[in-house]
């Protein structure tokens, strides 16, 4: 919300943005239902709950309590605003909620991707697989940044592994796909994450209001309220993260079914 108002194309008074900023600083957070957005015509329904809070209507979260907006404003020594022309529309006609959901998804995805290489390195070690397939020289032949980084991460993690080092001279030709193809899958997911992150960041710093008010007092309508870039970025991110889960499941299956005497079913030596 603040990024959009700061650009100056919404045709709203500075006091509206000021009140919103004061509410954020004092910890007054409008209660927005989990469901209700349409995205294709702006996040009308969820954003309306932010607008309601500014005029003293609806409910908010303040000081660890859910309460009426008017009560929270009074306790924080703030006054609700009386909306003027264009301000009501400006508050609800944008992609802010979709984008906020995207930011949260990116944060969680980043944590998952960062831990995925570490977890998979442990799987490589536990399965008595080789470290050699993660050598940077191999992966530099593929022009995918994510793959190169993932392979380098795993190769570095396993550097001091006595278990992996003891496997260097064994007679096994190749390890299962779920081990030696980790950088290819993790890397592809990292690249997709990076692209989604770029799109979401672009949306954060864009103007998604409609109509737009320009400095020469020209009023122009467009479709900036449409959240298609955000939607496609998050669809792609969902696919990327699901692939991390898929290869993880294959590694679990590998351990459960067993491979030989050194890697028995369920990892249980006796039973």
Residue ranges of model-derived segments:
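Glycine/serine-rich anion-binding loops at beta->alpha junctions
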Residues: 29-50, 223-231
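Short, small-residue-biased leader/transition segments that mark boundaries at the very start
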Residues: 2-4
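Accessory "access/gating" subregions that flank catalytic or transport cores
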Residues: 124-246
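Mobile "lid/hinge" segments at catalytic clefts and subdomain interfaces of large enzymes
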Residues: 46-153, 159
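FAD-binding glycine-rich core of flavoenzymes that anchor FAD
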Residues: 9-35
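Glycine/charged-rich beta-loop-alpha catalytic/anionic-binding loops adjacent to active sites
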Residues: 27-31, 74-83, 214-221, 261-268
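C-terminal catalytic subdomain
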Residues: 228-271
């Amino acid at each position: 919300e603040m990024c959009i108002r700061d650009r100056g194309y919404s045709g709203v008074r500075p006091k509206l943005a000021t009140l919103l900023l004061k509410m954020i600083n004092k910890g007054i957070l409008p209660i927005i239902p989990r469901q209700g957005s349409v995205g294709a015509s702006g996040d009308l329904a969820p954003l309306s709950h932010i607008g309601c809070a500014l005029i003293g209507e609806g409910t908010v979260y303040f000081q660890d309590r859910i309460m009426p907006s008017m009560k929270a404003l009074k306790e924080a020594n703030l006054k609700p605003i009386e909306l003027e022309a264009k301000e009501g529309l400006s508050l609800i006609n944008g992609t802010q909620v979709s984008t906020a959901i995207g930011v949260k998804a990116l944060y969680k995805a980043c944590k998952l991707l960062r831990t995925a290489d570490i977890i998979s390195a442990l799987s490589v070690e536990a399965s008595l697989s080789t470290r050699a397939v993660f050598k940077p020289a191999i992966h530099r032949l593929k022009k995918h940044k994510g793959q190169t980084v993932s392979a380098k991460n795993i190769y570095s993690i396993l550097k001091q592994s006595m278990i992996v080092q003891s496997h260097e001279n064994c007679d096994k030709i190749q390890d299962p796909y779920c081990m030696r193809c980790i950088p290819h899958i993790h890397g592809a997911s990292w690249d997709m994450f990076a692209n989604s992150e770029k799109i979401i960041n672009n949306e954060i710093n864009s103007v998604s209001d409609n109509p737009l008010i320009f400095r020469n007092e020209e009023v122009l309508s467009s479709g900036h309220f449409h959240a298609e870039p955000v939607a496609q970025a998050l669809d792609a991110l969902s696919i990327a993260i699901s692939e991390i889960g898929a290869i993880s499941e294959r590694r679990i299956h590998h351990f459960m079914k067993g491979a030989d005497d050194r890697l028995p079913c369920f990892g249980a030596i006796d039973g």
